[in-house]
Amino acid sequence: MQKERSPEQYQNAIHNALQDSQRVIKLIDGLLNLAKADYEPEQIKREEIRLDELLLDARELVLRAYPDFHVELVFEQEAEDDKVLTVIGNSYLLTTAFVNLIENNCKYSRNQTSFIQISFWEEWSIIRLSDDGVGMSDKDKEHLFQLFYRGENKDVASGYGIGMTLAQKILSLHKGEISVFSHPGEGTTYVVKLPHI
């Protein structure tokens, strides 16, 4: 038999149910995107993409989902040719990868901020995504791209251990590279290299 509850208790129950359903949706979306990242490269629709525009789109998606987050985008050097900012790839997948990286920066930083720097060198477009957060141990760095791995700082932010694996697979699918530089208490920097046209 159900007991009587106050309107406030019903509101809390509905709020909790909505949060649970949003978490399940995010988990399912992550798993579906992971499956897409496992496609053969020939199966992926590709086009020329301006990285600066893609990063602005990713920034907008993050800020829409998390209004308290801050994302700063800086160009380290002026591009004399648009080609150094243009890659061949799948816009949806690359946006997904960068949204995951930006969200991680913001979730684990002290002030919910991600600093993004764009530069280029030889055949590479280079994107550095940094935070001033809790950082990570060598053990966490070693397992960072392992599916479902949650590091020592898992209590700081919610997640499922899918985002970093997904980002790495997507970047690899685009002949890119990702590396992580971090020390406990000193923040984290992800360095992404993608071949430009």
Regions found by a protein language model. Give the residues of each.
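Conserved glycine-rich
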Residues: 175-177
